[in-house]
Amino acid sequence: MNIFLYYILPFIVVLGILIFFHELGHFLVAKYFGVKVLKFSLGFGSKLVGRQIGETEYLISVIPLGGYVKMLGEGENEDAEPLSPEEEEKSFTSKHTLKRIAIVAAGPFFNLFLALFTFCLFYMIAGIQIGVPEIGQITANSPAQEAGFLEGDVIIAIEGKSIGAWSEIKDAVQYSSGIPLEITVKRGGSLLTLTVIPEESVGKNIFGEDVKTGLIGIVASGRLQAVALSPLGAAKEGFWKTWEVIKLTCLTVIKLFQRVVPIKTLGGPILISQMTGQLAQENLLYLIPFMAVISINLGILNLLPVPILDGGLIIFLLIELVIGKPLSIKQQEIAQKIGLFLLVTLMAVVIFNDVTRLLE
């Protein structure tokens, strides 16, 4: 019972919200362009419950790992019965290619918009925690020790630029190897200006690659300060966090193809369920930014140019836009079979990784 309440239920709720907004994007833009939507389903497979409202049947299906919007004329084979003129006007295929691209792209972009809204909401509620720019430890024989820094010094400016958080120190120092920096510190009730020359060091980035960076040999005290944000401040913080996660997600995909990031690091539904459950037990509020990160990952994944994903369909439509006619049904089916194989293979790999982690 505890496993269901703490792991399975939060996972289903979070995934359900993400899938709903993804499919809502397709649905709303399709309706805006006058396309008849036959089905709106959360989940795949057999129908659990459903209700017809207007021209659309709304469903909850048995497999909760996805969803779909079925539009009139979408995916029809060449032997399908022709539509009446009235129905043809409402079909997906009758719309201009750019409108169809907008309908397909709306799902992933709604996931990105959801992430932006979710991050903004989180910062409105929780504010931010910043690391106080206070020195907790100084490395022996380091530039900082030679320059006269002491434990407990609070860095308030570097080269005349005000410092309000520990992260700003790293930003100022890492690209300044060999360049003298004037750093103003608060020591007791006095202000002192010390000159330090960062030394070049080779470290690892988050992908395990060697990177050169400037270091002065100081460690943060670890003291945190809670800062409440105004609505405008929360919106600004939410925007930059969304953009930061989008960039990191895209870079991670590139590094995967470059084999810099090992494929064994990929996680799937089991890992997401574990993380969702752990966060739900620790603090339900933490589920908000976690959901935003997963929403961005879902959006970027669906934009990959793989047949069967939204990105693959966008590629088909771009080809149609260039050559003036759609690919044949047979060509699309072959491409989609390849895409399905790739997707099933990926799912098998991430589930294998998840199970391996559990056994370890």
Would you name each region that the model predicts?
Residues 24-29, 109, 113, 304, ...:
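Active-site His/Glu-centered metal-binding helix of metallohydrolases
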Residues 3, 7-11, 95-104, 111, ...:
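Residue-level signature of transmembrane alpha-helical entry/exit and packing/kink sites
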Residues 150, 156-157, 171-212:
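PDZ-domain C-terminal substructure recognizer with occasional recognition of PDZ-binding tails
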Residues 33-38, 127-145, 150:
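Alpha-helical transmembrane signal-anchor/signal-peptide segments
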Residues 144-166, 242, 335:
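Conserved PDZ fold ligand-binding element
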Residues 32, 118-134, 356-359:
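Aromatic-capped interface at the extracytoplasmic side
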Residues 2, 87-95, 202-300, 312-338, ...:
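Functional transmembrane alpha-helices
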Residues 31-115, 220, 226-229, 234:
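Membrane-embedded helix-turn/re-entrant segments that form the catalytic/gating core
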